[in-house]
């Protein structure tokens, strides 16, 4: 199977790194019995970033390796040591790459300009350690927040060639020969249609003007509706400042002539849309052929009446090539002068709304089993649930405090929720709770440092945990001894049975 050297469309799965977990640790130092919390924050996960690289001209790398992952952030450690951030995955793409969401079709970005960047998957934020969670009411939290998952997104990359001039025309009109004659480009040239299947770029110097020319693959009638890969070919013209029609004056196909070819291609450009205002130039090619030269003379005035410059050239003999280069340079200079200057990007600061209830919404839904539940959605509640370690009762109490401060409990009561109702926080993978309203805030209760009396914690002490470990290992040893005894009895029974059979023989 041949490996394509030019790929202008690829689907990429970008997976950002996870954030590291925060650390729950208490400083232990001689003569400092109350050293306080010293758990560090987790590191942020790495992001997946697209960056325009002038050395890259194709998307072939993502055609073969379609999944790219950034590294995860490290978890925090004691002694206030924060975890290291994950490394960003920088992916080089050619200039003119259009990025869209493969599932929704949403346009994410249009990368034009060397060094332009776009974050396609943001890394997860690291969880806070208990040192960052401490306050006057919770002096030594016995928990930390978990790191958030990184974004995972499937994106579609489409390359639209960035060039000053696009050469358009029927297959075998001589576009590849023309770009090879006026630049150092070396396209594939052969005597059959659709020799060129991917755009070829060439740099042309005419006096003090330097510009790029794109040899767009041949167009046919119906290209604007997708016939003959028309969609793939036409999109490469969208960024060109000017369009040059290359007309074959030596065609011998029945039903074709230079003027009708020009009308057909121009009609396809108009039907594609967005190209009406681009300046045009018409090249009457292959005038080295006697009959073609006569035909070019006949139609020259008819084509010129359209208001476009017309050039007679021959890529074989070199006739008219030098004047054509300067004519295209003049076209490019005018197009550049008419381009509006890019306005500086305005930075708009939008403060968050003061009414925090806008940060979530609550709906009553069926649970699929004949009952119902209350579903709480919103960025903050969903993120807070993902950060919570549900194996730690104190962390669950902290989550309850945050939801109450946000107004979730008050809103549930206003909508008619009662104690014991099922409450789901998040989307389809939500965590479901039993609603327990009117719980006092942990700050209003007298307790030892870091404790939350709303929850009857069954967490054993350090001494009890050591005793449980010893009991566990003792039980495993007894279990192992029973197994060994059973295997010994089985072996002795088998030996006795064999001896009995031997005695009978």
UniProtKB/Swiss-Prot annotation:
The keyword Hydrolase applies. One of its GO terms (molecular function) is GTP binding. Pfam families: DUF1967 (PF09269), GTP1_OBG (PF01018), MMR_HSR1 (PF01926). GTP binds at residues 169-176, 194-198, 215-218, 285-288, 314-316. The lineage of its organism: Bacteria, Bacillati, Actinomycetota, Actinomycetes, Propionibacteriales. Its main location: cytoplasm. This is GTPase Obg. PROSITE patterns: G_OBG (PS51710), GTP1_OBG (PS00905), OBG (PS51883), OCT (PS51881). InterPro entries: G_OBG (IPR031167), GTP-bd (IPR006073), GTP-bd_Obg/CgtA (IPR014100), GTP-bd_prot_GTP1/OBG_C_sf (IPR036346), GTP1-OBG_CS (IPR006074), GTP1_OBG_dom (IPR006169), GTP1_OBG_dom_sf (IPR036726), OBG_GTPase (IPR045086). Keywords: Cytoplasm, GTP-binding, Hydrolase, Magnesium, Metal-binding, Nucleotide-binding. The gene is obg. Gene3D superfamilies: GTP-binding protein OBG, C-terminal domain (3.30.300.350), GTP1/OBG domain (2.70.210.12), P-loop containing nucleotide triphosphate hydrolases (3.40.50.300). Residues 352-437 form the OCT domain. Residues 36-46 have a biased composition (Gly residues). Residues 29-48, 447-472 are annotated as: Disordered. Belongs to the TRAFAC class OBG-HflX-like GTPase superfamily. OBG GTPase family. GO terms for cellular component: cytoplasm. Residues 163-333 form the OBG-type G domain. Mg(2+) binds at residues 176, 196. It is found in: Cytoplasm. It comes from Cutibacterium acnes (strain DSM 16379 / KPA171202) (Propionibacterium acnes). Monomer. Residues 4-162 form the Obg domain. It is an enzyme of class 3 (hydrolase). One of its GO terms (biological process) is ribosome biogenesis. Its cofactor is Mg(2+). An essential GTPase which binds GTP, GDP and possibly (p)ppGpp with moderate affinity, with high nucleotide exchange rates and a fairly low GTP hydrolysis rate. Plays a role in control of the cell cycle, stress response, ribosome biogenesis and in those bacteria that undergo differentiation, in morphogenesis control. Its EC number is 3.6.5.-.
């Amino acid at each position: 199977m041949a490996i394509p050297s030019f790929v202008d469309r690829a689907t990429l799965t970008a997976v950002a790194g996870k954030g590291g977990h925060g650390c729950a640790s208490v400083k232990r130092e001689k003569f400092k019995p109350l050293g306080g919390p010293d758990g560090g924050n987790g590191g942020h996960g790495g992001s997946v970033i697209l960056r325009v690289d002038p050395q890259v001209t194709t998307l072939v790398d993502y055609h073969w390796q379609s999944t790219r992952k950034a590294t995860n952030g490290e978890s925090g450690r004691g002694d206030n040591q924060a975890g290291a951030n994950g490394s960003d995955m920088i992916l080089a793409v050619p200039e003119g790459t259009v990025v869209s969401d493969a599932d929704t079709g949403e346009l994410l970005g249009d990368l034009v300009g060397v060094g332009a960047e776009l974050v396609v998957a943001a890394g997860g934020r690291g969880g806070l350690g208990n040192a960052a969670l401490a306050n006057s009411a919770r002096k030594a939290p016995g928990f930390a927040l978990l790191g958030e998952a990184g974004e995972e997104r499937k994106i579609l990359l489409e390359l639209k060639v960035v060039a000053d001039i696009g050469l358009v025309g029927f297959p075998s009109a001589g576009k590849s020969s023309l770009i090879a004659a006026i630049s150092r480009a070396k396209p594939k040239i052969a005597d059959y249609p659709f020799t060129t299947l991917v755009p070829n770029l060439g740099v042309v110097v005419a006096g003090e003007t330097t510009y790029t020319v794109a040899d767009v693959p041949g167009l046919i009638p119906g290209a604007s509706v997708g016939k003959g890969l028309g969609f793939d070919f036409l999109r490469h013209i969208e960024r060109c400042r000017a369009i040059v029609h290359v007309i074959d004056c030596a065609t011998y196909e029945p039903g074709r002539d230079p003027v009708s070819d020009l009308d057909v291609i121009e009609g396809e450009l108009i039907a594609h849309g967005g190209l009406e205002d681009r300046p045009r130039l018409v090249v009457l090619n292959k005038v080295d052929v006697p009959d073609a030269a006569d035909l070019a003379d006949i139609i020259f005035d008819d084509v010129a009446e359209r208001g476009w410059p017309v050039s007679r050239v021959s890529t074989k003999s070199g006739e008219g090539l030098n004047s054509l280069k300067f004519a295209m340079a003049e076209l490019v200079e005018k197009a550049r002068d008419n381009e509006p200057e890019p306005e500086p990007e305005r930075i708009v600061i939008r403060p968050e709304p003061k009414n925090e209830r806008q940060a979530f919404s609550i709906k009553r839904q069926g649970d699929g089993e004949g009952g119902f539940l209350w579903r709480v959605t919103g960025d903050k509640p969903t993120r807070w649930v993902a950060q919570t370690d549900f194996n730690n009762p104190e962390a669950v109490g902290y989550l309850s405090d945050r939801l109450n401060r946000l107004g979730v409990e008050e809103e549930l009561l206003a909508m008619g929720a009662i104690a014991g109702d099922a409450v789901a926080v998040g989307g389809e993978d939500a965590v479901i709770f039993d609603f327990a309203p009117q719980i006092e805030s942990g700050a209003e209760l007298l307790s030892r440092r870091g404790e939350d009396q709303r929850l009857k914690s069954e967490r054993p002490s350090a001494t009890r945990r050591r005793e449980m470990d010893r009991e566990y290992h003792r039980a495993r040893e007894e279990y192992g001894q029973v197994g060994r005894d059973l295997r010994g009895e089985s072996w002795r029974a088998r030996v006795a049975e064999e001896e009995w059979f031997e005695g009978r023989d």
